[in-house]
Structures are given as structure tokens and as C-alpha cells.
A protein has these predicted regions:
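Basic nucleic-acid-binding alpha-helical/helix-turn surface characteristic of O6-alkylguanine DNA
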Residues: 59
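PLP-dependent class I/II
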Residues: 2-4, 8-14, 19-56, 86-399
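Conserved N-terminal alpha-helix of the aminotransferase class I/II PLP-enzyme fold
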Residues: 63-96
């Protein structure tokens, strides 16, 4: 029998989804599972999106242009202008989710063997996309003790060599919820200029910043306009993960032309998804305001609750809707699997993402988990109770 490819063997399993079979088995046993593992918002999608879908009046559901509909891209120009990001419709390429934007950015900008510097912990799929592109992730450590702030510039420069081609950031950050400061963004800008690197900036959580600190986009950084590739998606801000609409944005025409070759090879981004996403830009201002307020309350509920559990510590996330928490366990992979396979409290259990999957450094994140606060406060409160009982019962507890 033929063997699968080396690429297929090296592709990492998702730390967010790899325990899903255990969760499904628990449900089959009648256990209620609180899903804290995945960034799937439970808040309603804007009604205008559903109205647009219901009002589709077409005889054919045709291919859309490979770059995405111009009407949608022109409307996005106005959206970004609200964040002081000046674009034209030609700067925007509509993609099948933010994930495709990351993959196409890698494919267009990196050669096999090229290296990308990424602060860790990092969104696990970045590693998968790098493998797909034949590139290599080089991680720079951030720690829970330091609130996941960036290390000094010298630590970055220790990693830079002749194969280094890019720095990748997620701001606000998934999985940590960290928000980069102006000083940190300027530090990254200076490195990009000094070593002539690409800067890939995943900014899908810009609506969710809780500190009062300003949102600093990579597109705000002067002097590196041709180096920046911005990644975006409607999945989180409008609870539209399933329509698979994202965007790759750059002022670099050479990058856009290369990306368009990959876009043409995959033919077109989703037609119906673009219709829904374009309509969502007309959602009432109260929609995003109410969504923001809800996440502020959920964040407080979760972080206060976690830090009341003996042996548990979580920093206060400044953005997105995740936190990385340290638990008093020997191994978070084992603990998360145990919660689903061997534990329940009053017929309930919790599904969390082991943080080790967000690191490439061996042993890092071994006693950490990522938790998404995408459940209503009543469910979060109950999930915290279940987690506390699980930690009390877990055989591998360390404190």
C-alpha cells in the first residue's frame, strides 16, 4: 500500500478539535459538554445577513470573481476607513475565510525552507499553513507570568538569519487575548524595516479590545506599507464562521498579483457568503456594541471565576475572547482528555483546548489550557464549577 506524504505526516492535529471524538462519545453517554475549546460565538448573526440570503433572486448561483465582488470590496473600504486604514477596493482580495488568506499569503511570499518568526503561544493553524507552504515556523517565547507581552528586540534578532522572510502576529491575540502596545508594534516595524521582512498581521478580533488602549493595526505603521499583509475575517465579529469569508489586504501590487494566481486556481470565494458578509456591514450599530458589552461581562465572569479556583491562574486578556490559564495538573493534554472520557460532575463536563498545541517548543504549555468565553454567563459559571470539581478529582493534580 502506498504511504502518505511527509507533509501529511508532519501536519499537526488541531489542539482545538482533536479531542472532539471524546466529546461526542461523552454526549452519547448523556453527558452535557460545555464547549470552551473553540472560538465559535454563540451570539446571533445579524438579521440583515439572513434577510439578504432569503432575498436572493438569482436563476444561477454562479462563480463570483476570483478577487471577490467589487461591491463588497468597495463597502469594505468604508469599513476600514472607520479604523483609519486607507485602502482602495483593489487592495482587498476576498478569501474563503481568514485561514485561506493566511495560506495564500504564505504561498505567495515564502519559498520552501523560508522561516517565519511567530510569538508563541500562537494559533495552531499557522503551523499547519506553514507546513503546507513548505515554510518553517520559528517561535519566540512569551510567558503567562509576563502576561504574554513581547520580549525585547534582541530576542527577535537572535532568531533572524538568511532564511528569515517574515514576522507573523495576531493582534488582539489568539490564544492569549494579548493586545500589542504602540511600543511593541514600533519594535516590530523597526525589525521589518531593518531586515526587509514581510509582516503578516492577523487582525480578525479588532472589535474586541477591552482596555481602552488604542487599536494599532500593522497598516498604521509608517514606512513598511509594502511589507504588510493584513489578514481579516467576518467569522468572529458577526458570528459568521460558517460562511467562510475573509480578506487578504496589502498595498503591495506584486503580492496581490501572486495571490491572485492562487485565487484563480481555487476559482472563487463563496457567493452566498459574500452576499451575507456585504449585508452585515449594514448591521445596526447596536449589534457590535451589544456584542462587545456581552464579551466584557463574560470575560469578567470567566477570569474572576478562574482565579478563585485554588491553584489556577489566568492573566486578564485585553482583547479577543480567549484566555490561556495555568492549571495545577501534570499534563493538560491528559487532563482535558480525562475530563471528557472519565469525568463528569452531575452529568456535566468541560471541553478545553490543551495549550501545548499552541506551542512548538517541546514541553511548553504543558499545564496550560486555552479557554474561549463564547458561552452565556450562566453556562460559564456552571462550567467553572465543573472545572473546579474536575481539578479536585483529577489523579494528576500537582498542588
Amino acid at each position: 500500500m502506498p504511504k502518505i506524504s511527509i507533509r501529511g505526516t508532519e501536519m499537526p492535529a488541531s489542539p482545538i478539535r482533536k479531542l472532539a471524538p471524546l466529546a461526542e462519545a461523552a454526549k452519547q453517554r448523556g453527558i452535557q459538554v460545555f464547549h470552551l475549546n473553540i472560538g465559535q460565538p454563540d451570539l446571533p448573526t445579524p438579521e440583515v445577513a439572513f434577510q439578504a440570503i432569503r432575498n436572493i433572486d438569482r436563476k444561477i448561483l454562479e462563480y463570483s470573481p476570483s478577487q471577490g465582488y467589487r461591491s463588497y470590496r468597495e463597502k469594505l473600504v468604508g469599513y476600514y476607513e472607520k479604523y483609519h486604514i486607507s485602502l482602495t477596493a483593489d487592495d482587498i482580495i476576498v478569501t474563503s475565510g481568514g485561514s485561506e488568506a493566511v495560506l495564500f499569503a504564505f504561498m505567495a511570499c515564502l519559498n520552501p525552507g523560508d522561516e517565519i518568526i511567530v510569538p508563541e503561544p500562537a494559533y495552531a493553524n499557522y503551523m499547519a499553513f506553514a507546513i503546507s507552504a513548505g515554510a518553517k515556523i520559528r517561535t519566540i517565547a512569551t510567558t503567562i507570568e509576563e502576561g504574554f507581552s513581547l520580549p525585547k528586540v534582541e530576542k527577535f534578532e537572535e532568531l533572524i538569519n538568511e532564511r528569515t522572510r517574515a514576522i507573523l502576529i495576531c493582534n488582539p491575540n489568539n490564544p492569549t487575548g494579548y493586545l500589542y502596545t504602540r511600543r511593541e508594534m514600533n519594535q516590530i516595524r523597526d525589525l521589518v524595516k531593518k531586515y526587509d521582512l514581510f509582516l503578516f498581521s492577523d487582525e480578525v478580533y479588532r472589535e474586541f479590545i477591552y482596555t481602552g488602549s488604542p487599536y494599532i493595526s500593522a497598516c498604521h505603521l509608517e514606512g513598511i506599507e509594502q511589507n504588510v499583509v493584513l489578514i481579516d475575517s467576518v467569522s468572529k465579529r458577526y458570528s459568521e464562521c460558517g460562511i467562510r469569508i475573509g480578506a487578504l489586504i496589502t498595498k503591495n501590487q506584486e503580492i496581490r498579483e501572486a495571490v491572485m494566481k492562487f485565487c484563480q486556481a481555487r476559482l472563487s470565494p463563496p457567493l452566498i457568503g459574500q452576499i451575507a458578509a456585504e449585508a452585515s456591514l449594514d448591521a445596526d450599530a447596536d449589534y457590535l456594541r451589544d456584542t462587545y458589552d456581552e464579551y466584557v461581562e463574560r470575560r469578567k465572569c470567566l477570569i474572576d471565576g478562574l482565579n478563585r479556583i485554588p491553584g489556577v491562574y489566568s492573566p486578564i486578556p485585553m482583547g479577543a475572547f480567549y484566555t490561556v490559564a495555568k492549571l495545577p495538573v501534570d499534563d493538560s493534554d491528559k487532563f482535558c482528555a480525562w475530563c471528557l472520557a472519565e469525568f463528569d460532575y452531575e452529568r456535566q463536563t468541560v471541553f478545553m483546548a490543551p495549550a501545548s498545541g499552541f506551542y512548538t517548543t517541546p514541553g511548553a504549555g504543558r499545564n496550560e489550557v486555552r479557554i474561549a468565553y463564547v458561552l452565556k454567563k450562566e453556562d460559564l459559571t456552571r462550567a467553572l464549577t465543573v472545572l473546579e470539581r474536575a481539578l479536585e478529582a483529577y489523579p494528576g493534580r500537582t498542588e
